[in-house]
Amino acid sequence: MASITANHPISGKPLISFRPKNPLLQTQTLFNFKPSISKHSNSSFSIPVVRCSIRRIPEYTPSHIPDPNYVRIFDTTLRDGEQSPGATMTTKEKLDVARQSAKLGVDIIEAGFPASSEADLEAVKLIAKEVGNGVYEEEYVPVICGLARCNKKDIDKAWEAVKYAKKPRIHTFIATSEVHMNYKLKMSRDQVVEKARSMVAYARSIGCEDVEFSPEDAGRSDPEFLYHILGEVIKAGATTLNIPDTVGYTVPEEFGQLIAKIKANTPGVEDVIISTHCQNDLGLSTANTLAGACAGARQLEVTINGIGERAGNASLEEVVMALKCRGEQVLGGLYTGINTQHILMSSKMVEGISGLHVQPHKAIVGANAFVHESGIHQDGMLKHKDTYEIISPEDIGLNRANESGIVFGKLSGVMLCKPKMLELGYEIEGKELDDLFWRFKSVAEKKKKITDDDLVALMSDEVFQPQFVWQLQNVQVTCGSLGLSTATVKLIDADGREHISCSVGTGPVDAAYKAVDLIVKVPVTLLEYSMNAVTQGIDAIASTRVLIRGENGHTSTHALTGETVHRTFSGTGADMDIVISSVRAYVGALNKMMSFRKLMAKNNKPESSAVI
């Protein structure tokens, strides 16, 4: 059997050793080694650093993975992630995120919950048709998955949406913990087992060959009951068994043991893929996910930036980079097919679209993740980067400097704008490209240098806006310490008519928001307001995020509890003027809320949401 070993030049000890464990894989190129030399600045010797490129993704079969070390990444950003308060996405935004997930190379995209609303149904269908039939490298095509409760209506809706993809999947679930069965479902164990078995069989009977089943709240379920119900759904045709720690209750050792015991005690488990879905209520979602993988799970459910219900989900970037960084050494050789150089761009896209800011000290993608301020650390970094960096920032798509030498400025042309945005992960053309370019030119007239972060902020503000009901034309404010601030706002409605209003307030932003309210005449409550400087300097672009809640209507029904939830809507704005940035964000949130109201009125159907 072939093997590859790289030794340390001084100690002679192995740095990396690779020996294929599966004889069927000996003819495939899984590693492409690229030795490079990293030198100490004040030393006379060099240390060879061996890096490897992305491994080949094994051919997809629903219930089997040819390479036992390969781990599938299931991205549920568009389903569970969107359930974060204020993270409501438009159909176009969901499509853009799905495209970016495909660039990442995720194996499965859970595109939504089609039965929750007609809007979600159409969004999942659009993603299935476009992203699920895309042309990618090495014959890769992502699986497109739709969530469904264990009932025929939900399953029919899910199949209606995902069947257009080359690789469609239905993900159905029912609760299995005593507290859920007794108080929420009001069903006996036998009834729950029969419902799960019959609905998995029904999903297979309508033509779906890839069916995932989740026993909701598995982390608090009786293990013996889990083995039984999982065995029954395997017999009914399930291809993936997802084990959700729905309330983030377990600790890593406990969750790893649960996965191991399921593999050891569930009849027929050798014919399916075991999956994990870990919530972050105790801050253990990444650790639990890795523990599950070490115990035998070969599908990991994650979200970009870890967004999701309550405290969020296991973070895609953390899980993937942990496997990349420690997979060979301590995680049994586990690896994924993720192109990690798209991680940072994916994070920024989801941050901009969802309006959920990434905390500066967030692992992997936070603003401080690769920043060194301590004098001792800085000294070490100057001598050798490996002293305080276990991950190269370039591995996630973060370039320390503009290596191309191309600087964006007011003299740059539109022909440079398109490839630059493509480099940043955005495919835009036509009117969207023109609008972005002229917005960029406007900023470039006032700002000497336009950074990548500036472009991303302008992209989010100009392109990732909901279908406009109202459009900001002008805003003029007067403020100071001598009296109330005043604001005059001009908005354009969908028919092109101008509306002007004036108001006073305790500050320029408050006055401007009150002027907008006088025009729109829709009562809302401002729940959150935040502003960040995109870059450094007095000429930095200000990025604003607001979260609002409508006073009338705008509710959704929780699919599991039946509870009425007051839906919130976020809006983002970007401009060098903080008042204009603030008003853009507020108008964007209002547009999203009013578009949602029109859609619900058109379909005359309440929306549902689901948690697993």
Curated annotation (Swiss-Prot):
Pathway(s) per entry: Amino-acid biosynthesis; L-leucine biosynthesis; L-leucine from 3-methyl-2-oxobutanoate: step 1/4
Enzyme Commission code(s) on record: 2.3.3.13
Reactions this protein catalyses: 3-methyl-2-oxobutanoate + acetyl-CoA + H2O = (2S)-2-isopropylmalate + CoA + H(+)
InterPro entries: 2-IPM_HCS-like (IPR050073), 2-isopropylmalate_synth_dimer (IPR013709), AIPM/Hcit_synth_CS (IPR002034), Aldolase_TIM (IPR013785), LeuA/HCS_post-cat (IPR054691), LeuA_allosteric_dom_sf (IPR036230), LeuA_bact_synth (IPR005671), PYR_CT (IPR000891)
PROSITE patterns in the cross-refs: AIPM_HOMOCIT_SYNTH_1, PYR_CT
UniProt domain Pyruvate carboxyltransferase: residue ranges: 71-344
UniProt keyword DNA damage, yes or no: no
Amino-acid positions noted as binding a divalent metal cation in the UniProt annotation, renumbered to this chain: 80, 277, 313
Keywords: Amino-acid biosynthesis, Branched-chain amino acid biosynthesis, Leucine biosynthesis, Metal-binding, Transferase
Superkingdom of the source species: Eukaryota
SUPFAM superfamilies: 2-isopropylmalate synthase LeuA, allosteric (dimerisation) domain, Aldolase
A GO term for molecular function: 2-isopropylmalate synthase activity
CC terms in the record's Gene Ontology section: chloroplast
Family: Belongs to the alpha-IPM synthase/homocitrate synthase family. LeuA type 1 subfamily.
HAMAP family for this protein: LeuA_type1 (MF_01025)
NCBIfam families: leuA_bact, PRK00915.1-3
Protein name: 2-isopropylmalate synthase B
